[in-house]
Amino acid sequence: MRLHLITVGEPKLAYARAGWDEYEKRLRRYHKVQVTRVGGRTGAQASEAIARAAGRAPLILLDPRGEQFTSESLSAYLDAQALDGRGELAFAVGGPEGHTDDLRARAHRLWSLSLLTLPHDLAMILLLEALYRAATISAGEPYHRGST
């Protein structure tokens, strides 16, 4: 399955760029990965750009109003989407203003990485690490050591 990762802007901090690069490389061993960076001076502009970038793919917005996954439940969700014949899922990290209500209404799902407020750069790394961890769980590989 192809995972389309959409972010507003580039990681700005060196640790974030390094983390993004590392987990993107790891994730590519399990999935086709497409990365799209969009711009937008306002939340509305960024949300419009995210919607255009996602196209017809089911859109999963990282949003504090969303549900939380365990690593195992994220793995199961991704496996179920693949079994249902979805060739692509789009995941979007919004900008500083978050997502618009219109984009939230269009989304296939809202996913909250944490109850904490996270810096944009850190949210991007957490997204990639969570997807990578889910892929290793599905593959039965030893990266994940949590309990099921």
Swiss-Prot record:
Keyword rRNA processing: yes
Annotated protein name in UniProt: Ribosomal RNA large subunit methyltransferase H
One of the record's GO cellular component terms: cytoplasm
Major location (coarse): cytoplasm
Family matches, as SUPFAM superfamilies: alpha/beta knot
Residues engaged in binding S-adenosyl-L-methionine: 62, 94, 113-118
Family listed: Belongs to the RNA methyltransferase RlmH family.
Entry GO MF terms: rRNA (pseudouridine-N3-)-methyltransferase activity
The keyword Phosphoprotein is annotated on this UniProt entry: no
InterPro entries per record: Alpha/beta_knot_MTases, RlmH-like, tRNA_m1G_MTases_N
Disulfide bridge positions per record: none
PANTHER family hit by this protein: METHYLTRANSFERASE, RIBOSOMAL RNA LARGE SUBUNIT METHYLTRANSFERASE H
Subunit structure: Homodimer.
Record field: catalytic activity: pseudouridine(1915) in 23S rRNA + S-adenosyl-L-methionine = N(3)-methylpseudouridine(1915) in 23S rRNA + S-adenosyl-L-homocysteine + H(+)
Record keywords: Cytoplasm, Methyltransferase, rRNA processing, S-adenosyl-L-methionine, Transferase
Role played: Specifically methylates the pseudouridine at position 1915 (m3Psi1915) in 23S rRNA.
Organism: Deinococcus geothermalis (strain DSM 11300 / CIP 105573 / AG-3a)
Enzyme Commission identifier(s): 2.1.1.177
Cell location: Cytoplasm
